Design a protein with these regions (language model features):
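Catalytic beta-strand/loop cores that center a nucleophilic Ser/Cys/Thr
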Residues: 43, 65, 129-201
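Extracellular ligand-binding/catalytic regions of CAZymes and related secreted enzymes
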Residues: 7-18, 40, 44, 179-193, ...
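A glycine-rich, often tryptophan-bearing local segment used as a flexible ligand/cofactor-contacting loop or short
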Residues: 77-149
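Helical hinge/lid and interdomain linker segments adjacent to catalytic or ligand-binding clefts
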Residues: 9-21, 26-107
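Conserved beta-strand segments of alpha/beta enzyme cores
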Residues: 48-50, 169, 204
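Short, solvent-exposed loop/turn segments at secondary-structure junctions
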Residues: 26-27, 77, 105-107, 175-178, ...
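Extracytoplasmic/secreted proteins, especially bacterial periplasmic and envelope-associated proteins
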Residues: 33, 37, 86, 145, ...
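Structural detector of well-ordered beta-strand residues that form the stable sheet scaffold
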Residues: 97-99, 171, 206
Length: 239
């Protein structure tokens, strides 16, 4: 139902879906540029999109629970109790979808374990730092509309080493160790989850570990994965 590199999604014949993008935190991840990219993807799919640069938007419970999709882009920083409760309750209790990428979703609020419980992983290392050439491999024995028809692909960027919830549904992985990249992890070869989905309460959750800079996600398969992930996660939309 979702061909590779489709220009449009499969939105239902009902009112427009809505998305709230909240960006901020560490500037090195270009959160403003990533927010604009995600806004454009969602707008092309017919979403009404609000973009905010304050976590106080999450504290508005009525706003959050009225959305189809919530997209955090907020590396590190801290989140207050009311801010967390707004997004947490919208996702867990009201089925509002949650989707994001890289440190903007899974290196946010590092001391907040409930955030990690909701999102499904936490960044812990990127051996070799930026500029590493590595492969992202679709998990072929786990067919899913997000990855249907898409090829494995090569990336030059940070390669995220995550601590991952064992309950997530892994759609793509990257191999560790990467040739030429040394570190204390090299004696523990593994296939690290790069793209996954999960359920959390009433909601769908989608995560893509790519996205150190906006250009990593701007074209080709990475962009298509974000597009499909947004649609799959969004309440009342789907693929």
């Amino acid at each position: 139902r979702t061909p590779a590199f489709s220009a449009t999604g499969n939105l239902p014949a009902m009112g427009k879906p809505s998305a709230l993008i909240v960006w901020g935190g560490w500037d090195g991840h270009e959160p403003d540029k990533v927010a604009e990219l995600f806004r454009a993807i969602l707008a092309e799919e017919g979403f009404e999109v609000e973009v905010s640069n304050t976590l106080d938007s999450f504290a508005d419970k009525d706003k959050c629970k009225a959305q189809s999709l919530l997209v955090p882009i907020y590396t590190m920083s801290e989140i207050s109790g009311p801010q967390f409760e707004g997004i947490y309750e919208a996702v867990k209790d009201h089925g509002v979808g949650l989707a994001g990428c890289h440190g903007g979703m899974c290196d946010s609020f590092r001391t907040h374990t409930e955030w990690q419980f909701m999102t499904g992983s936490q960044w812990v290392a990127h051996p070799g730092n930026d500029g590493i050439r590595y492969w992202v491999n679709i998990v072929r024995n786990n067919p899913h509309p997000i990855t249907a028809g898409l090829p494995d692909f090569e990336v030059v960027s940070e390669q995220y080493y995550l601590h991952v919830d064992p309950g997530v549904n892994v759609l793509a992985t990257t191999p560790f160790p990467t040739p030429g990249v040394d570190g204390p992890h090299v004696q523990n070869p593994c296939q690290m989850p790069t793209i996954y989905t999960k359920r959390f309460g009433a909601a769908n959750v989608f995560y893509n570990a790519l996205g150190h800079h906006a250009d990593v996600l701007e074209a080709g398969v990475p962009r298509e994965l974000m597009r499909r992930g947004f649609l799959w996660a969004a309440k009342g939309v789907g693929l």
